[in-house]
Amino acid sequence: INIILENSLSVYKVDVRKLKELNPDYIITQAHCEVCAVSFSEVENIVSKNLNKNTKIISLQPNTLKDVFDDIKRVAKELNIENEINNNLIKSLSERLKKIKELSSKQKNKPLVACIEWIDPLMIAGNWIPEMVGIAGGENILGKSGNNSHWVKFKEILNQNPEIIIFLPCGFNIEKTKEEVKYLFKQNSEWQSLKAVKNKKLFIADGNQFFNRPGPRLIESLEIFAEIINPSLFNFNHKG
Protein backbone atom coordinates (compact mmCIF):
# COMPACT_ATOMS: atom_id res chain seq x y z
CA ILE A 1 0.00 0.00 0.00
CA ASN A 2 2.95 2.35 0.58
CA ILE A 3 3.99 1.94 -3.07
CA ILE A 4 0.45 2.87 -4.09
CA LEU A 5 0.58 5.98 -1.91
CA GLU A 6 4.01 7.08 -3.03
CA ASN A 7 2.96 6.84 -6.68
CA SER A 8 -0.41 8.55 -6.05
CA LEU A 9 -2.35 5.51 -7.24
CA SER A 10 -5.87 4.83 -5.98
CA VAL A 11 -6.48 1.99 -3.53
CA TYR A 12 -10.01 1.70 -4.91
CA LYS A 13 -11.46 0.48 -8.20
CA VAL A 14 -14.84 1.00 -9.87
CA ASP A 15 -17.07 -2.06 -10.16
CA VAL A 16 -17.97 -1.45 -13.80
CA ARG A 17 -20.38 -4.37 -14.02
CA LYS A 18 -22.35 -3.14 -10.99
CA LEU A 19 -22.32 0.42 -12.29
CA LYS A 20 -23.80 -0.68 -15.61
CA GLU A 21 -26.42 -2.71 -13.78
CA LEU A 22 -27.45 0.29 -11.67
CA ASN A 23 -27.35 2.72 -14.61
CA PRO A 24 -27.52 5.82 -12.36
CA ASP A 25 -28.80 9.24 -13.36
CA TYR A 26 -26.19 10.88 -11.11
CA ILE A 27 -22.73 9.88 -9.92
CA ILE A 28 -21.18 11.79 -7.03
CA THR A 29 -17.40 11.56 -7.00
CA GLN A 30 -14.42 13.67 -6.01
CA ALA A 31 -11.36 15.28 -7.53
CA HIS A 32 -9.65 15.90 -4.20
CA CYS A 33 -7.44 12.85 -3.76
CA GLU A 34 -6.55 10.13 -6.24
CA VAL A 35 -5.42 7.75 -3.50
CA CYS A 36 -8.35 7.89 -1.06
CA ALA A 37 -10.93 7.38 -3.81
CA VAL A 38 -11.18 6.60 -7.50
CA SER A 39 -9.80 9.49 -9.57
CA PHE A 40 -12.20 11.84 -11.34
CA SER A 41 -10.59 11.13 -14.71
CA GLU A 42 -11.13 7.39 -14.25
CA VAL A 43 -14.79 7.93 -13.36
CA GLU A 44 -15.24 10.13 -16.44
CA ASN A 45 -13.60 7.54 -18.66
CA ILE A 46 -15.70 4.66 -17.31
CA VAL A 47 -18.94 6.62 -17.57
CA SER A 48 -18.26 7.68 -21.15
CA LYS A 49 -17.59 4.09 -22.20
CA ASN A 50 -20.28 2.26 -20.25
CA LEU A 51 -23.23 4.53 -19.45
CA ASN A 52 -25.60 6.68 -21.45
CA LYS A 53 -24.90 10.34 -22.12
CA ASN A 54 -27.59 11.51 -19.70
CA THR A 55 -25.67 10.29 -16.64
CA LYS A 56 -24.44 13.37 -14.79
CA ILE A 57 -21.21 13.39 -12.79
CA ILE A 58 -21.06 15.68 -9.76
CA SER A 59 -17.44 16.10 -8.70
CA LEU A 60 -16.52 17.52 -5.30
CA GLN A 61 -13.20 19.05 -4.27
CA PRO A 62 -13.53 20.66 -0.82
CA ASN A 63 -10.62 21.91 1.28
CA THR A 64 -12.39 23.54 4.24
CA LEU A 65 -15.56 23.03 6.26
CA LYS A 66 -17.21 25.86 4.33
CA ASP A 67 -16.37 24.05 1.10
CA VAL A 68 -17.98 20.88 2.47
CA PHE A 69 -21.17 22.75 3.40
CA ASP A 70 -21.21 24.40 -0.03
CA ASP A 71 -20.83 21.00 -1.69
CA ILE A 72 -23.76 19.57 0.28
CA LYS A 73 -25.87 22.48 -0.94
CA ARG A 74 -24.65 22.01 -4.51
CA VAL A 75 -25.53 18.32 -4.54
CA ALA A 76 -28.94 19.14 -3.04
CA LYS A 77 -29.54 21.70 -5.78
CA GLU A 78 -28.60 19.21 -8.51
CA LEU A 79 -31.00 16.65 -7.02
CA ASN A 80 -33.80 19.21 -6.58
CA ILE A 81 -33.96 18.84 -2.80
CA GLU A 82 -32.33 22.18 -1.95
CA ASN A 83 -35.04 23.54 0.37
CA GLU A 84 -35.30 20.31 2.34
CA ILE A 85 -31.52 20.08 2.85
CA ASN A 86 -31.09 23.75 3.75
CA ASN A 87 -33.98 23.73 6.22
CA ASN A 88 -33.09 20.44 7.88
CA LEU A 89 -29.61 18.99 7.38
CA ILE A 90 -27.62 22.22 6.94
CA LYS A 91 -29.46 23.87 9.81
CA SER A 92 -28.84 20.92 12.13
CA LEU A 93 -25.14 20.61 11.22
CA SER A 94 -24.59 24.36 11.63
CA GLU A 95 -26.21 24.40 15.06
CA ARG A 96 -24.09 21.48 16.28
CA LEU A 97 -20.92 23.17 15.02
CA LYS A 98 -21.88 26.47 16.64
CA LYS A 99 -22.48 24.88 20.05
CA ILE A 100 -19.05 23.25 20.04
CA LYS A 101 -17.34 26.44 18.94
CA GLU A 102 -19.07 28.54 21.60
CA LEU A 103 -18.28 26.16 24.45
CA SER A 104 -14.67 25.41 23.48
CA SER A 105 -13.89 29.11 22.96
CA LYS A 106 -14.20 29.63 26.72
CA GLN A 107 -11.13 27.46 27.32
CA LYS A 108 -7.95 29.51 27.74
CA ASN A 109 -5.45 26.68 27.34
CA LYS A 110 -5.32 25.09 23.91
CA PRO A 111 -3.35 21.82 23.85
CA LEU A 112 -1.03 21.10 20.93
CA VAL A 113 -2.60 18.42 18.75
CA ALA A 114 -1.00 16.27 16.04
CA CYS A 115 -3.40 14.55 13.63
CA ILE A 116 -1.67 11.77 11.70
CA GLU A 117 -3.40 10.70 8.49
CA TRP A 118 -0.90 8.04 7.44
CA ILE A 119 1.58 6.03 9.48
CA ASP A 120 4.36 4.81 7.20
CA PRO A 121 5.54 7.20 5.91
CA LEU A 122 4.12 9.74 8.35
CA MET A 123 1.56 12.15 6.95
CA ILE A 124 0.02 15.08 8.81
CA ALA A 125 -3.67 15.74 8.13
CA GLY A 126 -4.57 18.94 6.31
CA ASN A 127 -7.62 20.38 4.55
CA TRP A 128 -10.51 20.73 7.06
CA ILE A 129 -8.79 18.83 9.90
CA PRO A 130 -6.70 21.73 11.34
CA GLU A 131 -9.81 23.92 11.28
CA MET A 132 -11.81 21.28 13.14
CA VAL A 133 -9.10 20.88 15.78
CA GLY A 134 -9.23 24.64 16.35
CA ILE A 135 -13.02 24.66 16.67
CA ALA A 136 -12.81 21.78 19.17
CA GLY A 137 -10.42 23.79 21.34
CA GLY A 138 -6.98 22.59 20.30
CA GLU A 139 -3.99 24.06 18.49
CA ASN A 140 -3.17 21.96 15.45
CA ILE A 141 0.52 21.44 14.68
CA LEU A 142 2.30 21.05 11.33
CA GLY A 143 -0.90 21.13 9.24
CA LYS A 144 -2.62 24.28 7.97
CA SER A 145 -6.32 24.70 7.34
CA GLY A 146 -7.18 24.51 3.65
CA ASN A 147 -3.80 23.07 2.66
CA ASN A 148 -3.31 19.49 1.54
CA SER A 149 -2.12 16.77 3.90
CA HIS A 150 1.64 16.33 3.63
CA TRP A 151 4.50 14.01 4.52
CA VAL A 152 6.58 14.79 7.63
CA LYS A 153 9.60 13.38 9.40
CA PHE A 154 9.24 12.08 12.95
CA LYS A 155 11.76 14.72 14.07
CA GLU A 156 9.24 17.44 13.15
CA ILE A 157 6.67 15.87 15.47
CA LEU A 158 9.33 15.39 18.15
CA ASN A 159 10.32 19.06 17.97
CA GLN A 160 6.70 20.20 18.41
CA ASN A 161 6.12 17.65 21.23
CA PRO A 162 2.31 17.58 20.98
CA GLU A 163 0.15 17.09 24.07
CA ILE A 164 -2.39 15.06 22.11
CA ILE A 165 -1.77 12.71 19.17
CA ILE A 166 -4.64 11.36 17.08
CA PHE A 167 -4.05 8.64 14.49
CA LEU A 168 -6.83 8.71 11.87
CA PRO A 169 -5.44 7.05 8.74
CA CYS A 170 -7.47 6.90 5.57
CA GLY A 171 -8.50 3.38 4.59
CA PHE A 172 -7.81 1.66 7.94
CA ASN A 173 -10.27 0.59 10.61
CA ILE A 174 -9.35 0.98 14.27
CA GLU A 175 -7.96 -2.54 14.73
CA LYS A 176 -5.66 -2.22 11.72
CA THR A 177 -4.50 1.19 12.93
CA LYS A 178 -3.68 -0.25 16.37
CA GLU A 179 -1.46 -2.86 14.75
CA GLU A 180 0.34 -0.25 12.65
CA VAL A 181 0.88 2.10 15.61
CA LYS A 182 2.29 -0.73 17.76
CA TYR A 183 4.74 -1.58 15.00
CA LEU A 184 5.64 2.10 14.58
CA PHE A 185 6.49 2.40 18.28
CA LYS A 186 8.59 -0.77 18.19
CA GLN A 187 10.59 0.66 15.31
CA ASN A 188 11.26 3.97 17.07
CA SER A 189 11.38 4.17 20.87
CA GLU A 190 11.55 7.99 20.76
CA TRP A 191 7.76 8.09 20.45
CA GLN A 192 7.71 7.23 24.15
CA SER A 193 9.36 10.56 24.97
CA LEU A 194 6.45 12.64 23.64
CA LYS A 195 4.13 14.38 26.11
CA ALA A 196 1.07 12.83 24.50
CA VAL A 197 2.40 9.31 24.98
CA LYS A 198 3.70 9.92 28.51
CA ASN A 199 0.35 11.39 29.59
CA LYS A 200 -1.73 8.72 27.81
CA LYS A 201 -3.17 11.22 25.38
CA LEU A 202 -2.69 9.12 22.27
CA PHE A 203 -5.91 8.29 20.44
CA ILE A 204 -6.87 6.10 17.50
CA ALA A 205 -9.90 7.07 15.43
CA ASP A 206 -11.66 5.60 12.41
CA GLY A 207 -10.45 7.94 9.68
CA ASN A 208 -12.23 5.94 7.03
CA GLN A 209 -15.70 6.32 8.57
CA PHE A 210 -15.12 9.84 9.85
CA PHE A 211 -12.56 12.67 9.40
CA ASN A 212 -11.26 11.88 5.89
CA ARG A 213 -14.57 11.84 4.02
CA PRO A 214 -15.96 15.32 3.29
CA GLY A 215 -19.65 15.07 4.13
CA PRO A 216 -22.20 15.46 6.95
CA ARG A 217 -20.30 13.03 9.20
CA LEU A 218 -17.55 15.62 9.61
CA ILE A 219 -19.73 17.15 12.32
CA GLU A 220 -19.65 13.81 14.16
CA SER A 221 -15.89 13.90 13.61
CA LEU A 222 -15.82 17.36 15.18
CA GLU A 223 -17.68 15.98 18.19
CA ILE A 224 -15.04 13.25 18.51
CA PHE A 225 -12.29 15.89 18.42
CA ALA A 226 -14.14 17.91 21.08
CA GLU A 227 -14.40 14.87 23.38
CA ILE A 228 -10.70 14.12 22.96
CA ILE A 229 -9.44 17.68 23.38
CA ASN A 230 -11.88 18.87 26.06
CA PRO A 231 -13.30 15.76 27.82
CA SER A 232 -14.49 17.83 30.79
CA LEU A 233 -16.68 19.95 28.49
CA PHE A 234 -17.97 17.46 25.95
CA ASN A 235 -19.51 14.00 26.03
CA PHE A 236 -21.14 12.80 22.81
CA ASN A 237 -20.69 9.09 23.65
CA HIS A 238 -18.28 8.47 20.78
CA LYS A 239 -15.62 6.89 22.97
CA GLY A 240 -15.31 3.15 22.56
Predicted segments, located by residue:
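N-terminal ligand-binding lobe of clamshell/alpha-beta domains
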Residues: 1-240
